[in-house]
């Protein structure tokens, strides 16, 4: 069994919508509802903890009334940074050995990816899902190319990311003590010298970040309905 943690206190400035992007609609249903539905049928998911901006609590609670979820959902105070929100959520985790941390704006995660991440977390203590990088990647400084990075060793990392509760708590406490801010939770585990298992993600598992992503998401849903 695991607890799903969703840091949902961000404002999504790149979307330019003037509100939390999780409230934006894909096929007339909020992004966050699509995301929750991806997990609610998973028998291994015990409950869901969402770290939110307290000012948005009424909106989230209204969504849960309009779109009920078949799992217990708990709203807690989010932090100034995503990392703070996850740390706060860990404090509310009880009676489970593992947690999965997932971006609320990744509504197309598949059950296979979820199960693969959980299995790898049980094996290694920490796990991520990732896909091979398709594009050529170059390092650029002051407007000119300084290096072409070897693509064969690169992966684009997604969520969910899975962890034993004790390991993730240790990693977060260490980062907090050193004022270290990582780009994801796995980087905090890497920082304390622990292994992170990697499983195959999905190119459909996009993070809806920009207006263009909303159009892509609508297309994905259209294909799924066929």
UniProtKB/Swiss-Prot annotation:
**Pathway(s) per entry:** Isoprenoid biosynthesis; isopentenyl diphosphate biosynthesis via DXP pathway; isopentenyl diphosphate from 1-deoxy-D-xylulose 5-phosphate: step 2/6
Gene Ontology process terms (BP) = isopentenyl diphosphate biosynthetic process, methylerythritol 4-phosphate pathway
Q: Write the record's keywords in alphabetical order, separated by commas.
A: Isoprene biosynthesis, Nucleotidyltransferase, Transferase
Site positions per UniProt: Transition state stabilizer = 14, 21
Q: Which InterPro entries match?
A: IspD, IspD/TarI, IspD/TarI_cytidylyltransf_bact, ISPD_synthase_CS, Nucleotide-diphossugar_trans
Reactions listed under catalytic activity: 2-C-methyl-D-erythritol 4-phosphate + CTP + H(+) = 4-CDP-2-C-methyl-D-erythritol + diphosphate
Q: Which family does it belong to?
A: Belongs to the IspD/TarI cytidylyltransferase family. IspD subfamily.
What the entry lists under PANTHER family is as follows: 2-C-METHYL-D-ERYTHRITOL 4-PHOSPHATE CYTIDYLYLTRANSFERASE, CHLOROPLASTIC
Q: What is this protein called?
A: 2-C-methyl-D-erythritol 4-phosphate cytidylyltransferase
Provenance organism: Bacillus anthracis
């Amino acid at each position: 069994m695991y607890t799903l943690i969703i840091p949902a206190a961000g404002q999504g400035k790149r979307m330019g919508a003037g509100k939390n992007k999780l409230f934006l609609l894909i096929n007339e249903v909020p992004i966050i509802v699509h995301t929750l539905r991806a997990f609610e049928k998973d028998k291994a998911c015990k409950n869901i903890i969402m770290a939110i901006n307290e000012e948005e609590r009424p909106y989230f609670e209204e969504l849960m009334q309009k779109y009920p979820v078949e799992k217990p959902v708990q709203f807690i105070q989010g932090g100034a940074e995503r990392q703070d929100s996850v740390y706060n959520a860990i404090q509310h985790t009880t009676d489970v050995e593992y947690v999965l941390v997932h971006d609320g704006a990744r509504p197309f995660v598949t059950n296979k990816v979820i199960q693969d991440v959980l299995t790898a977390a049980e094996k290694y203590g920490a796990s991520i899902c990732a896909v091979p990088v398709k594009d050529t990647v170059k390092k650029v400084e002051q407007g000119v190319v300084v290096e072409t990075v070897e693509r064969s060793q690169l992966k684009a990392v997604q969520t969910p990311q899975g962890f034993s509760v004790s390991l993730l708590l240790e990693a977060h406490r260490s980062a907090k003590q050193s004022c270290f801010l990582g780009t994801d939770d796995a980087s905090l585990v890497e920082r304390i010298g622990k292994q992170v298992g990697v499983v195959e993600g999905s190119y459909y598992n996009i993070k809806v970040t920009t207006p263009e992503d909303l159009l892509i998401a609508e297309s994905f849903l259209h294909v799924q309905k066929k």
